[in-house]
C-alpha cells in the first residue's frame, strides 16, 4: 500500500495530473494534453477494484450501456441493437462466461461474476490498453482461476496491465512484473527475477 499503483493509473487515465514528467501512449500520443474522455477515446480503458455495474439492470442491459455509451441512459436501453452489435455483445458475454446469464439482474450475480461483467463492459468499448485494478479481491478460488484464464485470453488481443497484491495470482498471469515503491519502479522482469531481486527482498520482506 502507498507504493503509487493507483496514482499511476490515475495519471495514465487523466484523473490526476503529474507535477512533472511525460506520459505517452505508444510513440506519439501525449496523454497530458488530453482530457479523461479523450484518453478513453484513444483506446485506454480502466476497471476499478470495486465493480460499478447497474445492479437493478440485467446483464444484457449493462452490456448495452457499454455499447451505446454516446446516448442518454434510457435512450440507450430503448435503442435497437444492430445485428453486428448483438453479435459483439454475445461474443463478449461468452468470453466473460455470462452468455447464459444475459437476462439476470446484475445484482443477483456473485462478486466474481460482477467483476467479469464489468470487464465485459470494458471490452465492448474496444480499448487497446486495459488497466485492471485488483480484480480478484474477495473472489472464491474458482473465480480467481477463471479470472486468470480470462485475463490471459484478453492479453492475447490487447495490452493488459493488472494491479494486484495476490502474488500467486500474479504468478499465474504475468509475463512481466513491475514492483513499485514510493512512486518509483523498484524492479521489473519475470516473476522469478523480481522475487530474487535484493532490493525487493529488502523493501518488502525486510531481509
Regions found by a protein language model. Name each.
Residues 144-156:
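Helical segment within the ABC ATPase nucleotide-binding domain
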Residues 22-42, 81:
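ABC ATPase NBD Q-loop/coupling interface
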Residues 32-33, 92-108:
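Conserved ABC nucleotide-binding domain
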Residues 13:
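Helix-to-loop junction immediately C-terminal to a conserved catalytic motif
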Residues 170-172:
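A short, surface-exposed alpha-helical micro-motif characterized by mixed small hydrophobic
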Residues 130-134:
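Catalytic Walker B motif of ABC-type/P-loop ATPase nucleotide-binding domains
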Amino acid at each position: 500500500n502507498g507504493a503509487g499503483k493507483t496514482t499511476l493509473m490515475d495519471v495514465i487515465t487523466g484523473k490526476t495530473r503529474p507535477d512533472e514528467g511525460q506520459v505517452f501512449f505508444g510513440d506519439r500520443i501525449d496523454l497530458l494534453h488530453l482530457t479523461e474522455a479523450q484518453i478513453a477515446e484513444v483506446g485506454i480503458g480502466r476497471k476499478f477494484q470495486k465493480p460499478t455495474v447497474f445492479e437493478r439492470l440485467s446483464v444484457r442491459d449493462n452490456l448495452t450501456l457499454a455499447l451505446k455509451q454516446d446516448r442518454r441512459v434510457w435512450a440507450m436501453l430503448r435503442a435497437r441493437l444492430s445485428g453486428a452489435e448483438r453479435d459483439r455483445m454475445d461474443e463478449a458475454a461468452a468470453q466473460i462466461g455470462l452468455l447464459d446469464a444475459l437476462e439476470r439482474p446484475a445484482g443477483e450475480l456473485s462478486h466474481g461474476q460482477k467483476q467479469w461483467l464489468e470487464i465485459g463492459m470494458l471490452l465492448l468499448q474496444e480499448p487497446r490498453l486495459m488497466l485492471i485494478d485488483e480484480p480478484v479481491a474477495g473472489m472464491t478460488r474458482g473465480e480467481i482461476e477463471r479470472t486468470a484464464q480470462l485475463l490471459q485470453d484478453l492479453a492475447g488481443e490487447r495490452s493488459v496491465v493488472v494491479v494486484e497484491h495476490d502474488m500467486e495470482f500474479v504468478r499465474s498471469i504475468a509475463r512481466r512484473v513491475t514492483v513499485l515503491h514510493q512512486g518509483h519502479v523498484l524492479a521489473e522482469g519475470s516473476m522469478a527475477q523480481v522475487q530474487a531481486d535484493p532490493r525487493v527482498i529488502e523493501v518488502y520482506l525486510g531481509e
